Amino acid sequence: MDSNTVSSFQVDCFLWNVRKRFADQELGDAPFLDRLRRDQKSLRGRGSTLGLDIETATRVGKQIVERILEEESDEALKMNIASVPASRYLTDMTLEEMSRDWFMLMPKQKVAGSLCIRMDQAIMDKTITLKANFSVIFERLETLILLRAFTEEGSIVGEISPLPSLSGHTNEDVKNAIGILIGGLEWNDNTVRVSETLQRFAWRSSNEDGRPPLPPKQK
């Protein structure tokens, strides 16, 4: 077994433990917690594949990290951190739009991977806009926080949200879920628009199939 593979796993185990302690103090935001859940599942799989005990690997990983920190100057650490690409958090929705309760007359729910898709099948002949809050890294969607479908009157008629009990999602997972939501809403003769932010980072095929972009005044 390659020694780099083992030491990488050990360091990942220790760093996950540090992040878990941070989350236990209720300091992590939604993208942070989502990555924590995804990485936990990944570490369990890697541990099983490598035949390594996670608790033991965590202790060894701590020793490796402590040794690196002893050798590294504060200035070097700052430079290393600054050179790593950081994710950006993009918002189509206000806090009020994200936290608002909504109800469905004819509810429909579908689970696609680790994403839950909900929509009101009673909505007909409406112009609907999809808005989302999510993080982006390397110009691609990293983590979806919440996506909601709004009528022109401001009513919420659909939603895509991550399932807390399951591991994280990919850009393709989100794209697939958006397609399901759009298809369900269009079935009742609704016209569905996708926000420019979503088009850019998560629904690139919108230009290919002729779906019109969100007019600037509705952005």
Curated annotation (Swiss-Prot):
GO MF assignments: protein serine/threonine kinase inhibitor activity; RNA binding
Which GO terms of the cellular component aspect does the record hold? host cell cytoplasm; host cell nucleus
Q: List the disulfide bonds.
A: none
For the motif Nuclear export signal, what are the positions?
137-146
Gene Ontology biological-process entries: symbiont-mediated suppression of host cytoplasmic pattern recognition receptor signaling pathway via inhibition of RIG-I activity; symbiont-mediated suppression of host gene expression; symbiont-mediated suppression of host mRNA processing; symbiont-mediated suppression of host PKR/eIFalpha signaling; symbiont-mediated suppression of host type I interferon-mediated signaling pathway
Q: Where is this region: RNA-binding and homodimerization?
A: 1-73
**Family note:** Belongs to the influenza A viruses NS1 family.
Query: What does the record say about domains?
Result: The dsRNA-binding region is required for suppression of RNA silencing.
Instruction: Report the function annotation for this chain.
Output: Inhibits post-transcriptional processing of cellular pre-mRNA, by binding and inhibiting two cellular proteins that are required for the 3'-end processing of cellular pre-mRNAs: the 30 kDa cleavage and polyadenylation specificity factor/CPSF4 and the poly(A)-binding protein 2/PABPN1. In turn, unprocessed 3' end pre-mRNAs accumulate in the host nucleus and are no longer exported to the cytoplasm. Cellular protein synthesis is thereby shut off very early after virus infection.
- Subunit relationships: Homodimer. Interacts with host TRIM25 (via coiled coil); this interaction specifically inhibits TRIM25 multimerization and TRIM25-mediated RIGI CARD ubiquitination. Interacts with human EIF2AK2/PKR, CPSF4, IVNS1ABP and PABPN1.
User: What is this protein called in UniProt?
Assistant: Non-structural protein 1
Record gene name: NS
